[in-house]
């Protein structure tokens, strides 16, 4: 038995409420188990507790037994890249070398892990040139190369496109076929969830096992509608589109009945804006790096009140497109083309401006919110983001009052008022991204550039994102967002574009 958890719980030092309470779970060799829950439900704590990573963080209760080796990939895979290497091959085999394996054995295991994840072509690539999803797979390859008996993955698919997620599901099933086990946790239903043998729900520290219907589940799988209802009841976001939803017989057992807790209705996108003058025009945008063409003649217009979503495979260039618009490409990239704030030929060419000047028209929210945060509280972060107009000394008190009023308004609009005195890095990742969105909004840009805004969000987080975007669009702004969440892209955007081979097209 790779892992047995009996009446386990955990209380973090300095807190009164337990993060986990009375958890009992058995992880059987050769199986893949999924535990889903809302943000803050304790999914990450469960991973760390089972992986033995919380001894100094608080007080555990109950009994946890593991048989064999255990490895954990946290919800921030970037933090598990060593920082000691610059190339994929070296990074992947480093963990094996540190565990004392011979160089030839370590390299063989590393190459096999990359091949299993279908990224063996990245062996010689520089880590800095990889997309967020590719870096996530490299972090996973380091652990798979160690071949632990129990592989614990916290939100392993959050930066991956649907095709890669399906491939990863196949890889993990093959991993389990070697009498090893996998535990995955997350806030969203996706291809990995549907490939699991069992699905559990974690709600405010308590694991719902569905034992009331366990006997029935052994005979017939829970229906797809019941599974979807259970997800909504536990504030789990279901990324499946209607055509992608599996038949009821393919849905994992042990989905639980809906609770009585009300679920807020999603914010519906506003009607597509009427024809109007564009507020951003991109013409013949080209980006290359080391002689390789990444973007090839991109043409794009954004209109007031419009949300345009861009999908594409990992490494297709979605982040590169947004960074080229805001002026944040690294020095190894060359960029050409016209980026006009308005109709082509009528507004300033942003391509000729530095990033700080472009930010007057464009708000930037990157994939990793941590790199855009620097203050000690949420409120101070927003105070720093307020543009400071020129003023005389005698007007300083009035200007400060105006800044405070602006900050209070943005805190309210983005739902951050209740955490205004928290440290940004004490917030969960979706809330941190909300804070970066708020910081961009407070500068009053015409266009918001959102890179993977749905990563790691539960159902409530998705509704919160939709509400913030809807408010911005009603004020006449436009949003350009990249995403791997096809359901959100189809339900929330006015236009859906696909980036492949450097070009944009309608899917």
Model-inferred region functions:
Residues 140, 437-438:
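Hydrophobic anchor residue at the start of the ABC signature
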Residues 105-122, 398-419:
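Conserved ABC ATPase "signature" region
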Residues 151-155, 448-452:
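Catalytic Walker B motif of ABC-type/P-loop ATPase nucleotide-binding domains
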Residues 144, 440-441:
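ABC ATPase C-loop
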């Amino acid at each position: 038995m790779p892992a047995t958890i009996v009446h386990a719980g955990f209380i973090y030092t300095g807190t009164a409420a337990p993060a986990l309470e009375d958890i009992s779970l058995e992880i059987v060799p050769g199986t893949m188990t999924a535990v889903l829950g809302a943000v803050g439900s304790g999914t990450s704590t469960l991973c760390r507790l089972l992986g033995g990573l919380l001894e100094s963080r608080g007080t555990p209760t109950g009994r946890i037994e593991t048989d064999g080796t255990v490895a954990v990939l946290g919800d921030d895979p970037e933090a598990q890249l060593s920082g000691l290497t610059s190339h994929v091959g070296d990074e992947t085999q480093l963990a094996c070398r540190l565990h004392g394996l011979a160089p030839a054995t370590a390299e063989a295991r590393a190459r096999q892990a990359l091949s299993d994840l279908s990224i063996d072509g990245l062996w010689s690539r520089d880590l800095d040139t990889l997309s967020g999803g590719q870096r996530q797979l490299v972090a996973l390859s380091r652990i798979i190369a160690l071949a632990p008996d129990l592989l614990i993955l916290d939100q392993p698919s959050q930066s991956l496109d649907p095709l890669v997620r399906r491939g990863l599901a196949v890889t993990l099933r093959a991993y389990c076929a070697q009498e090893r086990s996998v535990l995955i946790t997350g806030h969203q239903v996706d291809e990995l969830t549907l490939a699991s043998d069992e699905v559990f729900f974690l709600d405010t520290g308590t694991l719902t096992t569905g034992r009331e219907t366990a006997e029935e589940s052994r005979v017939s799988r829970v229906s797809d509608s019941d599974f979807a209802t259970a997800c909504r009841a536990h504030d789990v976001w279901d990324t499946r589109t209607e055509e992608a939803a599996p038949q009821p017989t393919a849905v994992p057992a042990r989905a639980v009945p809906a609770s009585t807790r009300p679920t807020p209705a999603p914010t519906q996108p506003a009607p597509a804006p009427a024809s109007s003058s564009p507020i951003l025009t991109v013409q013949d945008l080209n980006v290359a790096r080391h002689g390789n063409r990444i973007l090839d003649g991109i043409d794009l217009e954004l209109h007031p009140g419009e949300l345009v979503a861009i999908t594409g495979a990992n490494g297709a260039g979605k982040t590169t497109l947004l960074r080229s618009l805001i002026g944040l490409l690294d020095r190894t990239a060359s960029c050409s083309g016209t980026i006009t704030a308005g109709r082509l030929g009528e507004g300033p060419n942003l391509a000729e401006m530095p990033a700080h000047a472009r930010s007057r028209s464009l708000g930037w929210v990157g994939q990793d919110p941590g790199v855009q945060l620097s203050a000690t509280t949420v409120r101070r972060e927003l105070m720093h983001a307020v543009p400071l107009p020129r003023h005389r000394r005698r007007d300083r008190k009035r200007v400060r009052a105006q800044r405070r009023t602006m900050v209070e308004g943005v805190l309210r609009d983005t739902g951050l008022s209740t955490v205004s005195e928290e440290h940004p890095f004490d917030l969960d990742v979706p809330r941190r991204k909300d804070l970066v969105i708020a910081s961009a909004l407070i500068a009053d840009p015409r266009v918001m550039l959102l890179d993977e805004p749905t990563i790691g969000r539960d159902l409530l987080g998705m509704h919160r994102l939709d509400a913030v975007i809807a408010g911005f669009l009603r004020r006449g702004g436009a949003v350009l967002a990249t995403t791997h969440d096809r359901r959100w892209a189809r339900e929330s955007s006015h236009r859906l574009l696909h980036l492949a081979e450097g070009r944009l097209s309608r899917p």
